[in-house]
């Protein structure tokens, strides 16, 4: 099964036109690798909007499991 994850830049609306297609059960680390291979090494935290979080946005760590149509904003060190 596949899920759609959308990215968001700080101060800008989410980019719903160009999402990432990933397997169900992937973590924030997998999303970082899909964006850029060195992004996971520079990862500080992520803000996630969607059904995988209790609050919108919620600050999550690298092991957070993403769900379909989540929006992620990655903050680097």
Which residues does each PLM region occupy?
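C-terminal-of-GTPase-core extension/linker across diverse P-loop GTPases
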Residues: 1-77
């Amino acid at each position: 099964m596949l899920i759609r994850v959308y990215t968001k830049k700080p101060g800008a609306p989410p980019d719903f036109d160009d999402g990432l297609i990933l397997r169900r059960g992937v973590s924030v680390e997998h999303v970082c690798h899909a964006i850029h291979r060195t992004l996971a090494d520079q990862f500080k935290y992520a803000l996630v909007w969607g059904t995988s979080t209790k609050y919108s946005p919620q600050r999550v760590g690298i092991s957070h499991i993403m769900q379909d149509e989540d929006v992620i904003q990655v903050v680097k060190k």
